């Protein structure tokens, strides 16, 4: 597991109040991990803080799974 993947999974577990072991790449935030719309907004904000990035609303709407979040962080994190 990459450092970014581990950081993303840790943030998701903390934000959604689930065990890190439940946070696997294919899980959807709402359907699988019980997130609501406020949770997803807070999750995006936590990812922005962790990786020093800004996630526009149109991109945030597409981040619906753990893998989406990992891919976005990998692609957009500041060096």
UniProtKB/Swiss-Prot annotation:
Subcellular location: Cytoplasm
Main location: cytoplasm
Entry GO CC: cytosol; membrane
Residue ranges occupied by any Carrier domain in the UniProt entry: 2-77
Keywords: Cytoplasm, Fatty acid biosynthesis, Fatty acid metabolism, Lipid biosynthesis, Lipid metabolism, Phosphopantetheine, Phosphoprotein
UniProt signal peptide: none
Post-translational modification: 4'-phosphopantetheine is transferred from CoA to a specific serine of apo-ACP by AcpS. This modification is essential for activity because fatty acids are bound in thioester linkage to the sulfhydryl of the prosthetic group.
PROSITE patterns attached to this UniProt entry: CARRIER (PS50075), PHOSPHOPANTETHEINE (PS00012)
Pathway: Lipid metabolism; fatty acid biosynthesis
GO biological process: lipid A biosynthetic process
Annotated InterPro entries: ACP, ACP-like_sf, PKS_PP-bd, PP-bd_ACP, Ppantetheine_attach_site
GO molecular function: acyl binding; acyl carrier activity; phosphopantetheine binding
Residues the record lists as O-(pantetheine 4'-phosphoryl)serine modifications: 37
TM stretches of this protein: none
Protein family according to the UniProt entry: Belongs to the acyl carrier protein (ACP) family.
Purpose: Carrier of the growing fatty acid chain in fatty acid biosynthesis.
Protein name: Acyl carrier protein
The organism of origin for this protein: Polaromonas sp. (strain JS666 / ATCC BAA-500)
Lineage: Bacteria, Pseudomonadati, Pseudomonadota, Betaproteobacteria, Burkholderiales
